[in-house]
Amino acid sequence: MARYTGATCKLCRREGMKLFLKGDRCYTDKCAFVRRSYAPGQHGASRKKLSNYGTQLREKQKAKRIYGVLEGQFRNTYERAEKMRGIAGENLLKLLEMRLDNVVYRLGYGASRTEARQLVNHGHFLVNGKKVDIASFKVSVNDVITVCEKSRGSERFKMFAENPKALPKWLEANVENFEGKVIAEPAREDIDVPVNETLIVELYSK
């Protein structure tokens, strides 16, 4: 599967804000955005005023980068969101939140979505008792996500278990059993990403 292989910190600088793509490092002075908060490139320090289209495009790019999704997948996800009941923009964010890699990240198994995606791809998780190694797999309400038995002894997973993170309302976890459960669909107020989804809808509606 295609994926972005460039410098992660440049993505935050391009969007003009921290996207927290590197987990704990983003909270330290080592974060590249702290040292250089302007866009990369020769003329990055002098930001031009964006047109309406440019603003909408930047918002889409920001959402793609936060969730680690490339254009084709993002477009397909939007088209699914558009066909669902409700508000297309909110549906889009809900679908992105319900990706397995994001759920693993929200459960605390990964300092970043990138790390969570790698853990999924390497086959460390079961969904309802069956191994799933596809990061884009869409989980559903009442699905149970479990760390594989053979992975639980690793220092990485022990560390995650010893330092549980606060969960969104739509998830619950049993840390001792290395298990999490989707108990509801995420509401918009439960999704803490700095994205104005209305601008994305406007962009795709043209």
From Swiss-Prot:
Q: How does it assemble?
A: Part of the 30S ribosomal subunit. Contacts protein S5. The interaction surface between S4 and S5 is involved in control of translational fidelity.
Its domain of life reads Bacteria
Q: What does this protein do?
A: One of the primary rRNA binding proteins, it binds directly to 16S rRNA where it nucleates assembly of the body of the 30S subunit.
The S4 RNA-binding domain covers which part of the protein? 98-163
Mind telling me which InterPro entries this protein's record contains? Ribosomal_uS4, Ribosomal_uS4_bac-type, Ribosomal_uS4_CS, Ribosomal_uS4_N, S4_RNA-bd, S4_RNA-bd_sf
Which gene does this sequence derive from? rpsD1
Q: Does the keyword Magnesium apply?
A: no
| Record key words, sorted | Ribonucleoprotein, Ribosomal protein, RNA-binding, rRNA-binding
MF annotations from Gene Ontology: rRNA binding; structural constituent of ribosome
Alphabetical GO biological process terms: ribosomal small subunit biogenesis; translation
Q: Which GO terms describe its cellular component?
A: small ribosomal subunit
PANTHER family given for it? 30S 40S RIBOSOMAL PROTEIN (PTHR11831), SMALL RIBOSOMAL SUBUNIT PROTEIN US4M (PTHR11831:SF4)
The UniProt entry, under CDD domains, shows:
S4
User: Gene3D superfamilies from the entry?
Assistant: Ribosomal Protein S4 Delta 41, Chain A, domain 1, RNA-binding S4 domain
The family note in this entry says: Belongs to the universal ribosomal protein uS4 family.
Protein's recorded name? Small ribosomal subunit protein uS4A
